[in-house]
Amino acid sequence: TTNNNNTKAVPEAKAALKQMKLEIANELGISNYDTADKGNMTARQNGYVGGYMTKKLVEMAEQQMSGQQR
């Protein structure tokens, strides 16, 4: 078996995750993230998007686990 960390646990969530990534990039002031060449962006910019997205996903999971909904 291949250990591919990019494989989605829930493939149906792909569109929602992409939309969330775009919204987070926009919140961080990166307005054209969907069409931007990620190779021309700094590691810091790309890291902010991924890190903030992870933070939001963890918050959502914690809320769901505690029975709270926003």
UniProtKB/Swiss-Prot annotation:
Per the record, the coiled-coil ranges are none
Q: Which Pfam families match?
A: SASP
**What are this entry's molecular-function GO terms?**
double-stranded DNA binding
Q: What keywords sit in the KW lines? A: DNA-binding, Sporulation
Annotated site (Cleavage), which positions?
23-24
Keyword Amino-acid biosynthesis in annotation:
no
Quick one: signal sequence residues?
Answer: none
Q: Which GO terms describe its biological process?
A: DNA topological change; sporulation resulting in formation of a cellular spore
Member of which family? Answer: Belongs to the alpha/beta-type SASP family.
Q: What else is known?
A: SASP are degraded in the first minutes of spore germination and provide amino acids for both new protein synthesis and metabolism.
Function per UniProt: SASP are bound to spore DNA. They are double-stranded DNA-binding proteins that cause DNA to change to an a-like conformation. They protect the DNA backbone from chemical and enzymatic cleavage and are thus involved in dormant spore's high resistance to UV light.
Q: What's the protein here called? A: Small, acid-soluble spore protein alpha
